[in-house]
Amino acid sequence: MAVMAIGLSIACLAAKAQTIAGKITGKITDSTQQPLNAATISLRIVNKPKPVKYEVSATDGTFLIEWRKAGTYTITATAVGYDRYESAPFTIDSLHPESALPAIILKKAVVALAAVTVTSKKPFIEQKVDRTLVNVEAMINSAGSTALEVLEKAPGVRVDPNGSITLKGQQGVAIYIDDKPSYLSGQQLQNYLQSLPATVIAQLEIMSNPPAKYDASGNGGIINIKTVKEKMKGYNFGISSGIRVSKYTSTNNNLDFNYRTNKFNIFGTFSAGNRNNFNDIDIYRKYMDDDGNTTGTFMQNSFIHKFGGGYRASLGVDYFPSKKTTVGVLVSRLERYPKSTNRSLGTLYNENHQPDSSLNSNNDENGSFINNRINLNIKHDFSKNGPSLQANVDYLEYNTNNDQVLTTDNYTSTGSLKSEDQLAGYLPANIRIYAAKTDYEQTIANQWKLEAGAKFSYTKTSNVANYYNVIAGVSEPDYDKTNHFMYDENINAGYLNLNRMFNKLTVQLGLRYEGTLSKGHQLGNVLKPDSSFNRSYNNLFPTLFLLYKLDTNSNHQLKFNYGRRIGRPYYQDLNPFISPLDKLTFYVGNPYLKPSFSSKYELGYIFRNRITTTINYSDTRDQVNETIEINDQKYYSRPGNIGKTTSLSFGIDAFFNPKPWLTFQLSGQMNYIHFKSSFYTGTLEVKNQYYYTQALVQFKLKNNWTMQLDGNYTSKSKNAQFVFAGRGRVNYSVSKMVSPKVTVKFNVTDVFLTGINKGDIANLKLTDANFRTLSDTRAALLTVSFRMGKRVEGQRKKIESGADAEQDRVKDK
């Protein structure tokens, strides 16, 4: 027994001796000494192929592997577009518990696309000092989806049932495409994002507080959608085709190509497809007298079918007269031909809930949306790692048209036809935007990075609404609804930005000036007088970003940022138009809208570049919201300024990769919002607490199969007058790489059909109202993609557009 006890004691001591607090540290850079973020590091026992642990490099390229077992090891490092690196063997034991590896330099890969399968990938989320990056290519269920559906899965981003996009609880988000503003908003922005296939999106840049380099417009911040671009010399092209099946069937097809030599880079895309979806809407309104007694009710069902096709094409050429200079031109054209039919049946009831009359409405719309754009740019680097100067000139033109015929049959309580009305509308619009900007960058004393620039933009819009009452086949002008509105706007801006990285602290300071001159002119008619307005305002917009590393390995980081923003009204919202949806529902413009201003603060903690927690506070004056007014039982929807809005939110975003084949992404947001403003009914004051949560899990299976499950849920929430019920959805997707050239992806959205939009509308004059909308959120999507080509090392320099804010302010209707 004594011998056995001694033997067990020796074994335990030996086992204890082999358990150590080991640490392996290092830094990964490319051949130009630039740190590589999100490179995959694998720890292996010498002569054994299976890794025992994985890590991902931080934003500064550093990594830390904690390991408790003694032995002889080697590490490998991989990153997309780079050759694999393997270290020399090293030992971890009680005498050598820590190993600081020499600098790891990854070399650019030279590959033939048809002959290699890249197994390393970027993480779903990356954190920078002034933005969050979402790598869309890491989401397999993006296949067959649209840009709008991709945005719904991004951390902190919420797309409400009306298509309005909020970021960390804030409205007024500006959408950019490849550093160029979309100049779209409302229904037009929603339509555009639905027409943009997810297969052409590489990354989302989410900036809740954008730096001074970006335009100050957009109280909610900026979401920059970066499309896929080939950065290597050689040639490549890709083709993808997808089909979406729900109640109706839609298709989406995409082609992209790139060819680069020492002197030229030619690239382009072409997308074509059709949209085919629906909204099934139930509306209930209860009318009351001053004592709260019911005087009548209105119940309506509307089935709206939206369909139509279109295409999007772009072509760009870069010329490299020298290694230091790039001259480029980019042209693009977007054509869409949306159509819709709205079949509505509404019944009016008296105070005893007996049918009084009914309305049967048919609203047919036939539209067109054409956007042409040209960008000229030049960039010159005066020396390697030295000053650089970039200039852009942009011209954009939007031509839209919408022909509308609204027919309403009015029936008595017995079902007899009482009257028949027909209203025809013709609504052409034109928007022209001219913009020019310059940007200068220089490093001062090898410490401070200086950025400075200036911008000029001029926008001219013309919106016409011609309405006619059709009686017995004869058209008579309806001057009450007919309107012609013109609007001119000039913005001049300049900015200065300074950035410095100290030992553990990164500081970025910015100041932007913007001066605005605007003029609106409504041409009169026989019923309406001619009217106009002029406005001028000049403002400063400071920004501050701080990022502090609590340790040398960037495992624990603190960040803080502050910024001031402006929310300029959308161009068409200033147009005092009136557009009927049916006999009792109208959309109206507001020429008296004022710009809104907000101050935003954010404090955050980042753990190992995987978990980020943030606290956000904002104070906004004159925020623009949709408002609802009831007059003579008619429902008017118009944009209006909400006097003061304060918002406080707490958020967490987490990314886990516990196994090589398993990935988790979790996001959550708690929001408190307080609205207070003068209103149609007196004072509007809304206090609201709600939460939003999102989860994603991805499995990498054998034989090049990948599976993904994700979902989200939003609790009951309020937005000015709107009270939305809680809703959520679950999505499923699976992907198979058939060969290095061919990938097939299948996914189902809203599997359990829980994404139903319903709620109430508050603060209506002597009226209660609620709604329920069923859309084709549940759908099956199948996408097949093919890619081939040959590429060698070489990168296209990033060129930004000069039109950086105006494109977010264009609307369809």
Stretch-by-stretch model annotation:
Residues 29, 40-44, 78-82, 97-140, ...:
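Short, acidic, small-residue-rich periplasmic hinge/interaction motif at the N-terminus
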Residues 46-62:
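Short, acidic Ser/Thr/Gly-rich low-complexity loop/linker segments typical of extracellular
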Residues 103-105, 147-150, 189-191, 218-240, ...:
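N-terminal periplasmic accessory domains that precede
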Residues 180-208:
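Short acidic/polar hinge/loop motifs at secondary-structure boundaries
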Residues 248-280, 293-342, 370-372, 542-544, ...:
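Transmembrane beta-barrel wall of Gram-negative outer-membrane proteins
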Residues 433-437, 478-483, 594, 600, ...:
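Outer membrane beta-barrel strand-and-loop segments of large Gram-negative receptors
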Residues 483-490, 566-619, 637-648, 657, ...:
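Outer-membrane beta-barrel signature, preferentially recognizing the C-terminal barrel domain
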Residues 517-519, 553-600, 615-633, 751-765:
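Surface-exposed extracellular loop regions of Gram-negative outer-membrane beta-barrel proteins
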